[in-house]
Amino acid sequence: GTDGSGYDAIIRPVGGTRNQLKAEDLELKMCEDGRMRHQLQTRMKGMDVFSFAITTAPKSIKQLAEQYELSLDDVDYYVLHQANRMINEKIRAKLKQSEEKFPYNMMTFGNTSSASIPLTIITQLAKETLERTLSIIGCGFGVGLSWGTVYFELSNPIISKLVEL
């Protein structure tokens, strides 16, 4: 889904087609939060993003489970966008699920944006997928504000070794 009313919660003010980059956009200026930035740097309204994530992600996961008659307790793992551990822990608490069902990799890789869900699967769950079929709910959320939730079963996938450049 998407909620365009939150378009400015995570935004790069210039660049692209909406506001094309001009030379003066690269000059550092004092921003509302007291930090010096140029207009090409991303800005985030942290509390708006936090509120969005901890409200929308659990709701989306519950809607998916209801639509497909899944019991949340029967899902092996919940693989969430690895943006912020506090956000993911709040989502986990709202779903009333154990810590073991929420793998993390952000301590190693940080916020890897759209790569965070597959990266978490290959670094945290790959070995277990060779031993048994795993039921997984993935939920990503971010810029826009936008979100997506998926349920899938993973059994003996072909997963390449992690390549670090």
Which role does the model predict for each range below?
Residues 49, 64-67:
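Short helix-to-loop capping/linker segments positioned immediately adjacent to catalytic or ligand/cofactor-binding
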Residues 1-51, 55, 59, 153-165:
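Condensing-enzyme catalytic core mediating Claisen C-C bond formation in acyl metabolism
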Residues 54-59, 65, 73-165:
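Claisen-condensing/thiolase-fold acyl-transfer catalytic domains that form or cleave C-C bonds
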